[in-house]
């Protein structure tokens, strides 16, 4: 009896710790002449609340639309145009994956996410006329993570794989398509500069509005956060920025992170497929969305499946599955938050070794004159027996990859003698001087790194 009472009390106090409301009296938001919020607080949780509040004041609509997409509610807001996104969110089973991996997330970061959620919810409570879809609220850390999960699946080209299956067009699918324009980053150490200072600069080619437009903010807490930079709608931390010790930024990269598999179905047997010497059965689901007809919301549904490989769809030629690393990771936002708080290159690099962010080039510089470039990503370790540029056989464990290359195994440059690193959405094998570039021969061709130039 006493043991049970202890467990109940422990659970009660544990829950109270992680659900305490933010004291807004500890938060100060000062806007400069450009309207950029400079946010000061005692804790990181309060800081996240302040960021959510300031961003909501400026662009509450975009934050909501991002979360609506991540929580399969966008069609409730915009009707038919939102239905494909809602279906995609359900196809990748974001809710199930996040529920299963939620306990792996650092509790300190969950507190930060909770603070951000409280800020959004309070703004919605005080501005009900600005709420787009009531069902979205209250925002929770899990709802926040579901949007991140969707966004990172799309950035891994997963949506293009899904479209190829729908359209039964795999010939035109090219994950290494070249951009006409590219974001660019560069860092210079004192080996290159003539004033003894280290520099990093970035020109990311982001839109001026929408969910992938930058929002600038300056964050200061008594728990060690001191950073200025930019973030996306709905993210509780800075995604590219500089603190008192270091700076980092991103451009887009396109190594081969995503694969499509065609299942070998058992004839005259519903949803059964061959895998090695076994017969397995697809799990069946129904995704729902809403369309408006004469102002009346009509619910529509579509079947989808799950195989041992991942999300699965049927088209006129068979059943196909999509597999990419982002489908098995939920800690990317946590990793970015920890990057915010890093104090040295070694600390920053160890955070990268979490290997939770599925892509993006990273450029870096710090006050100790370190500069660094890496083509980051969740790159599967694949069996050389197969050609990974097309549709793969989905009937053998030989194609079911489960491991990824470690951070130290990816193309990178650390403190080159040339004194500079750069990237413009192009090949990682041209990221510094000719003599110090990563050598493509050192990397498995199945990693699929870009070889083209840009800008």
Enumerate the predicted regions with their spans.
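Bacterial Sec-dependent N-terminal signal peptides
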Residues: 1-21
């Amino acid at each position: 009896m006493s043991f049970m009472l202890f467990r109940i009390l422990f659970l009660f106090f544990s829950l109270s710790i992680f659900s305490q409301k933010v004291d807004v009296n500890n938060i100060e938001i000062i806007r400069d002449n450009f309207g950029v919020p400079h946010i000061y607080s005692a804790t990181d949780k309060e800081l996240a609340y302040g960021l959510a509040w300031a961003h909501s004041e400026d662009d509450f609509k975009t934050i909501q639309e991002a979360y609506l997409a991540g929580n399969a509610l966008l069609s409730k807001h915009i009707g038919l145009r939102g239905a494909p996104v809602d279906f995609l969110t359900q196809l990748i089973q974001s809710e199930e994956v996040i529920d299963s991996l939620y306990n792996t997330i650092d509790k300190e970061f969950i507190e930060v996410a909770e603070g951000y959620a409280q800020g959004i919810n309070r703004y919605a409570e005080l501005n009900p006329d600005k709420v787009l879809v009531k069902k979205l609220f209250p925002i929770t850390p899990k709802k926040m993570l579901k949007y991140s999960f969707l966004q990172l699946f799309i950035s891994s080209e997963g949506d293009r794989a899904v479209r190829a299956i729908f359209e039964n067009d795999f010939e035109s699918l090219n994950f290494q398509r070249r951009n006409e324009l590219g974001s660019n980053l560069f860092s210079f150490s004192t080996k290159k500069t003539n004033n003894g200072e280290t520099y990093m600069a970035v020109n990311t080619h982001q839109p001026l509005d929408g969910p992938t437009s930058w929002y600038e903010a300056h964050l200061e807490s008594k728990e060690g956060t001191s950073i200025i930079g930019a973030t996306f709608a709905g993210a509780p931390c800075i995604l590219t920025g500089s603190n008192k010790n270091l700076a980092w930024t991103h451009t887009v990269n396109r190594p081969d992170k995503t694969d499509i598999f065609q299942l070998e179905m058992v004839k005259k047997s519903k949803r059964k497929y061959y895998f090695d010497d076994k017969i397995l059965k697809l799990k069946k689901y129904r995704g729902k969305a809403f369309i408006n007809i004469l102002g009346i919301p009509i619910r529509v549904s579509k079947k989808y499946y799950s195989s041992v490989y991942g999300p699965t769809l049927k088209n006129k030629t068979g059943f196909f599955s999509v597999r990419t690393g982002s489908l098995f990771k939920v800690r990317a936002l946590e990793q970015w938050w920890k990057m915010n708080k890093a104090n040295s290159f070694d600390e920053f690099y160890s955070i990268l070794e979490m290997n939770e962010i599925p892509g993006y080039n990273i450029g870096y510089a710090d006050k100790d004159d370190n500069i660094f470039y890496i083509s980051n990503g969740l790159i599967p370790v694949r069996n050389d027996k197969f050609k990974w540029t097309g549709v793969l056989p989905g009937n053998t464990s030989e194609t079911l990859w489960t491991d990824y290359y470690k951070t130290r195994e990816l193309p990178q440059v650390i403190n080159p003698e040339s004194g500079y690193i750069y990237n413009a959405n192009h090949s990682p094998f041209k990221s510094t001087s000719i003599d110090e570039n990563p050598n493509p021969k050192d990397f498995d061709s199945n990693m699929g790194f870009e070889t083209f130039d840009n800008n």
